Amino acid sequence: MNETIPGSIDIETLIPDLMIIIFGLVGLTGNAIVFWLLGFRMHRTAFLVYILNLALADFLFLLCHIINSTVDLLKFTLPKGIFAFCFHTIKRVLYITGLSMLSAISTERCLSVLCPIWYHCRRPEHTSTVMCAVIWVLSLLICILDGYFCGYLDNHYFNYSVCQAWDIFIGAYLMFLFVVLCLSTLALLARLFCGARNMKFTRLFVTIMLTVLVFLLCGLPWGITWFLLFWIAPGVFVLDYSPLLVLTAINSCANPIIYFFVGSFRQRLNKQTLKMVLQKALQDTPETPENMVEMSRNKAEP
C-alpha cells in the first residue's frame, strides 16, 4: 500500500525531491564560494581554469535540479514545447560539460607528470581557456542537434534513423570521455606507485583522485542509464529517475566538500581562511615531511 501525505504527495517522490533540494542548496553555496575565490581572489593556473569551469557547471546543474524538484513538490507542470526542451537540454549540456571538464583535468595532470619538460616549456599558454570554451560550445551543440534530429525541438521533424545514429554518436562521445578519464587516472596511479620513486603525493593529486572517484560512484550511473536505456525501453523519460538524480546532486555537491577536506587536512582551521584552504587543496607541490599528506597512514611522516 503506497504511503501518501496530505496534499496527495507520494512519499517516494517527496523524499528524493527533498534530498535533491538539501544537497542542491549545500552544493550551490559551496560551488558559489569556489567560483568566487577562483574567479576573483586567486591567480588562475592551468588547473584552476578547469576547476573554475567545473564549479560553474556544477552550480548551474544543481540550480536546475532545485528548480525541477521544487516544481515537483509544488505540483506545478513545466510548460510544454520549447521551454521544456530548453530546460532539459541545459541539464544535459551541464552534465556533459562536467564530465568533459573532469576528463580534461585528469588528462592535464597526466601530461604534467608524464611529460613535465614539454608541459612546462612547450605547452601553449592559453590551452586551458581555449579547451574550456571548446567544451562548452561542443556540449551545447551536441545537445541542440540531438533535440533537432529527435524531434524535441520541432515536432514536425523526426527521423528515427538519424535520431538513432546521433544517439549512438553521443553515447560514443560519452564513452570516449569516460575512457580518457579512466586511462589518465590509471596512468597517474601507475606512475605514482610503480614508475617513480621520487614522485610524492600532492594535495592536487589527492583532490583529483577523490573527485574522479565520487564521479564514478555518483555521476556516471545517470549518464549510462540516460543513453543506454533508450535502446532497452524506448520512450522512457530517463531524467525522471529519482535515485539517479539524487546521486548526480551528491556528485555536484561533493567537489567543494572535497576541496575543503583536502585543504584543511592536518591544518589548524582557526588560522585558515577559505581562500587558504582552497589554495592548499589545489597545491601541486609536495609538502615538507612534517606536514605531508599521507593517505595510507594515520600519522605524519617523521
Swiss-Prot record:
The chain crosses the membrane at residues 18-38, 47-67, 82-102, 130-150, 168-188, 212-232, 243-263. One of its GO terms (molecular function) is G protein-coupled receptor activity. Residues 1-17, 68-81, 151-167, 233-242 are extracellular. Its main location: membrane. CDD domains: 7tmA_MrgprA. GO terms for biological process: acute-phase response; cell surface receptor signaling pathway; chemosensory behavior; response to chloroquine. It is found in: Cell membrane. GO terms for cellular component: axon; neuronal cell body membrane. Residues 39-46, 103-129, 189-211, 264-302 are cytoplasmic. It is a multi-pass membrane protein. Expressed exclusively in dorsal root ganglia and nodose ganglia. Expressed in a subset of sensory neurons that includes nociceptors. Expressed in the subclass of non-peptidergic sensory neurons that are IB4(+) and VR1(-). Glycans are attached at N2, N68, N159. It holds the Pfam family 7tm_1. Keywords: Acute phase, Cell membrane, G-protein coupled receptor, Glycoprotein, Membrane, Receptor, Transducer, Transmembrane, Transmembrane helix. Belongs to the G-protein coupled receptor 1 family. Mas subfamily. Orphan receptor. May be a receptor for RFamide-family neuropeptides such as NPFF and NPAF, which are analgesic in vivo. May regulate nociceptor function and/or development, including the sensation or modulation of pain. Activated by the antimalarial drug chloroquine. Mediates chloroquine-induced itch, in a histamine-independent manner. This is Mas-related G-protein coupled receptor member A3. It comes from Mus musculus.
